[in-house]
Every structure is written in C-alpha cells, then in structure tokens.
Amino acid sequence: MAGRQGQPSLNAKPVAAGTRVAQRVMLLAKTSEPERLRQHGARIIDNIGDIYIIDTPVTGLEAMSRERGVERLEAGLPCTALMDTTATITHADRLWDAIIPGRDATGLAGRGVMIGVMDVGFDVTHPVFLGEGGMPRVAAFWDQLDTLQTGRPVEGTDTVYVGRQYLTPDEIKAKAFSTDSRLTAHGTHTASTALMIATGQTGGITSVEDMHSRYAHPSKREGATLCLVSNYTSDGRDAVSDERRSLYTTATDILGFKYIFDRAAELSMPCVINFSEGAHDDLYESRLYCEAIERLTGPGRIICSSAGNEAYKGTYMAKPQGRERAGAFIATGSNQAFYTIASAEPPTVELTFYDDSQGKRETVAYDLTRLREYPDSVELDTINTPTSRYITAMVIYPSCYDDGRYATELLVMAPDEKTLPDAISIEIVGRENDIEVYASGGWFRADSHDTTLSSFTRDHNILFPSSARGVVCVGGTAYRTGLTNYKGEWMSSDVGREGRRMSYSSCGPTMAGLTKPDIMAPGANIIAAYNSLFMEKNPDDASRRWNVMEFDYDGRHHAWNSNSGTSMSSPVATGIIAQWLELCPTLSPSDIITIAANTATHPENDLTYPNNMYGYGQIDAYAGAMYISDHYTGISSPALPPSSTVETWYDVAGRRVNGMPQRPGLYISSGGKKLIRR
C-alpha cells in the first residue's frame, strides 16, 4: 500500500524509457537452509543465528518465498529522523565526580563503554568529538551512503556491502563528514548530546559560555568511545540514486545495529546504541526485525530509541461495541492519507466528500467484508467529485497481534493535486464491532462541516522500533520555554514546563498493547553540537536561528545549537545508561526498566506509574547509579519489582480499569490486547 511513511506514491512519475531501475533489494530472511537463498541469486551479507541479511534480485523473490525451507522474508521502509541544563536536571552531572561505594575510580563517564549512534548528518570535526591530540573519539565510522574509495569496504560473508567504513583515527579525521551532511545536521546533535551527558566535566554547567569553555576544545578527560553509522532515511532521498534506493531497508538498519555491537565486542566493551529515528507501527508485524533486535540485545548490549513526536495531532479513533459509529475528518500535508483499521469483523467505512463550491456532499460506503472474497484481498476505486478525482485503495489481512481480528489498510489520495482539495470525513460503522483506527500517514481533525465527528485522541502513536519489546523507548519532557540565540534574539519554544511531558511526545499504548514509553528524559531546547558543513551549505536555513553560539575552530565555523524533540531525549538517556554500564557492564534492557521502575522521578504525582504518557517516569542518573551499586554489581538479572507482576487492565484509550473489566470490549492487560466477550 502506498502512503506508508517514505513510500513512493501511487501517482509517482513513470520511469523514462532506458532508465535503470533497481533490480536488487535488501531483506531479512529466516531459514535453517541458507543455500536455498543462494539458489535464487541472494548474497548473504551477515546473519544473526538463522536470520540472514541478504541482498537479492527482485525477480527471484516469488520463487524464494515458495521454498519450504524459507520461513519468512521481510523488508520495511527506512525510518525518518525525529527532532545546557539537561545533565543537572537528570542528575548526570552528580555522577561525573561522585564517590561510588566499592569503587576506586572517581565519577562515572562511560569509561570502557561504547556509545553507538545510528543517525544522519554527522560532523566529527566539531571539537566536542575530539580527544587528546585533536583526534576523534570515534572507534569506527560506517557511512552507508559513501561511494568514495578512500574508506575501507565493509566485508560481508559473500560480498562487499553498501558504503565505506573508516577505522583509524587518521581515517576518521580525514573523513570528517557523513555523505548526507549537506542535507541534515541531526546526527551531530544527537551524538554530541549522548557523549556530553556521559563524559561531562568537573562541576555543573551554568551557561552556554561555561559549556563552550568545557567542550569547544579537545578533551583529555577519559570517557565513552563513539561508534557511528550513517544510515539512509526517507528524509534523505537526494543522497541516494534511484537504482540503489531498494538496498536501504529495515534490514540495512539491522546490519547497522549489528555492526556497532560487533565493534564493541572486538574491543571487549559493553555498548548502548542511540537511534533517534522512527516509522509508523503496523499490524502485519516486522517479525524478523523484532526477533533480530531481541537477539542482538542483552547483557551489556542496549538500544535506546525515541518515542516519536506524534502527539500534537489526532492519531487514534476507537468505536466500542454497542456504539453504531464513530468518525472524524481526514487531515494530511500531502495529496494522500493512510489509515489502518483493526476489528474483529471487517466494518463498513463511509467516506464523505464535501464540495463547498456547490454546497453538496457525496458519501461512498465500503463494506470491507467483501475484501476477504477477493483473491488478493485488495480493492481499488475511483471517485469523481466536482472539484477533483480521488483514488481509494484497501487491503485486508489477519492482524499479527490478535487471533481472529483483521487489519485493513485504507489509502485516500488525489493524484492530480498537491493536497487533498476537499474536506473529507471518515466514519466507521458496526454496532457489534470493537473497531480501532490508526493514522499511519496523515491524522484526524475536527471540522465545522460536521462538529459531531471528533472521535479521535492524540495517543496510540509510539513509533517503530520504539514500540518493540527489547528496545528502551524514550519520551520527552520540557523545562525551558525558549532561549536567546547567537544574535541576541529571544526564540520562544514553549512545548511544556516544569518537567512535564512535551506536548507532542508520543504516547502509548502500542498496537501490540504494550505500555510505552519506557522512560522519559528532557527533550525541549537541548543545546548540543551543530553540523558545520550543513551550516556552510545552507547558510539561510531556519535551524541556524536556533544557534546559541557560533565560533571558529581549526579552520571551520562551528556552532552550539538548540533543538527539540524525542530525538534529543533518547541520547540523554543513552548517555546516562553509558554511565551505568561503566558501573555494571552486564546491564540488560530489562535491567534498565527495573532500575527506572525503582528510581525514576514522577513528573505528575497524581498518575499511576508506569503509564502511557510517562512510562516509569523521568530517568534519574544518580538515583539509578545508587540503586545499581546496591543491587546490581555482580548480579546479572535481578527479578522485576513485585508490583510489575500484578495484572492491571486498561481500556484501549489507556485508562486504567478497576479490577477485571465487567463490560464486553477490547482491553489491554499483561502486555497485550484481550477481547472480553459477553
């Protein structure tokens, strides 16, 4: 289905005659007989047990999928990048010089720990990344978009895969920038945030000038080591040629995670990876991706990922059993909107097109039960209104999370327009059906054409892979409401105050019914390093107004920049976890959740924790370290707190239910969705 985040549209321009079209794609494949993959032209790049990362011809996919020994083939679209006093707020600064019971060393700075960052737009010439002698504090740098011959090939089992890698300090210093740095500065900000939180300097930071004096020069202070992977996202289409774009999928990202963990293993280091990217969750399940993540992570191997910035808009609509219908208006910034519908039985969907020029409306009803009768479970339709031509597309399949429930994907688009020209409402109908609708490419809104259609909420919008088990999902809190930029101008950015959730920080539950986020960290107006090449190539970009200081170093013009989003929250948590891994190198993802359950601060005391707004609360570096010192050093995996074993029920809006639900309907309990029948 078109309309998924980053997916080419149905109205994409036709390929010109003679244009070279991509013939190979990167996939995850599960099989105990890898030779069956090779028989169809696949090249095995790497493997995680019986999950293989392969580069294979598109023409051989159908035959490969029929092989009895091949259990599953899977590839998803690339993710999208999500966008001081932070160390003091989280108490990370107290660990920089803390006396930890039972330890000879003073302070925690991530010594002997690798911080991996897979992101876009790296600039390692910024002095925050430089260690003694002015050399980068980076153990390895894999630029997946690099086509230059100056770097080393990335050796796979049978082939040299995408990009080039840089492994020595001299190579990394000469590399300087990721290939996409002219397009984005995102990774420079996230990587420097994680590094500064982990390593710190003596004492607290009280001003931008104080931060500049501590970080704007090569540091002799010991601390965490970086490993960088520059990946492809749907934002950076200009960085990759059309014929190579199919080589960059979720399988390529798994390869990036494995690359970082492998480099850490070579150096005998525990590792925490930051991933400030995400894509909309789905109901057909990225099963192999999630299984690969679970195999890659474990003691001393942790992935932190940003929750998403989706809660500023309507993203979820529910119609409980016993109610005839629910509805809202379609909203999108493009010419198409995309929604995922989950229900025990396929419902009826009504789309109403409002023609303001003639004061008319036209309603089209789709009985989704008939989709099951079609061989390919797909239906396409064309609707002509007085103002435009619309195409609708629908596909139905069993939901991967609930036995007996269906998922229907619905696309509405105006192929001849840049935006949807008419007001369009969507209503789901069926009194006996519990129905959920997720905004997967677009959102819901209210409209004066029919004020009764406003059944949406701003939750159920945690992005993938943060929605997956085994990934530490980080939401964002806010303290600053603005700042003064390098020109002396006040820049207002009020998305929350007093440590409460940023207004747009994504909320759970996930499509699988998991309570997410797991933890919170500051994410509003976070000051960190800025990409100097991006600034050079885009001197008038609006993001430059958020520079709080600009300065020259080693022949380049650098800056400290303020940015906001859960992209910034995740590396704050990553830096703190690097401190904890120095104290106890065997911490696992489940250990991080346990520590948070016992030590995180609660921004809103009237709530029950964990919940789908804050998870277990805001990460507290110092309290967590004290807890580790008392409970974890030398202990591989203590049990979860007793309270976490109590069965708690929530409705699909995330509201807690007292005791066992008495009314029939769809509920969430024990980490999954459950249907209570009459």
Regions found by a protein language model. Give the residues of each.
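Hydrolase catalytic cores
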Residues: 199, 229-234, 258-271, 300, ...
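Residue-level detector of functionally pivotal "anchor" positions at catalytic/ligand-binding pockets or at interdomain
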Residues: 628-653
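Protease zymogen maturation seam
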Residues: 66-114, 124-128, 150-159, 170, ...
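Short acidic, glycine-rich surface-loop motifs adjacent to enzyme active sites
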Residues: 229-231, 255-284, 306-307, 425-432, ...
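Autoinhibitory N-terminal propeptides
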Residues: 1-105, 114, 234-235
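Active-site core segment of subtilase-fold serine proteases
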Residues: 122-192, 202-208, 219, 267, ...
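Subtilisin-like serine protease catalytic core
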Residues: 100-251, 268-272, 285, 298-300, ...
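C-terminal subdomain of the subtilisin-like protease fold in secreted/lumenal serine endopeptidases
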Residues: 14-17, 270-272, 277-279, 283-285, ...
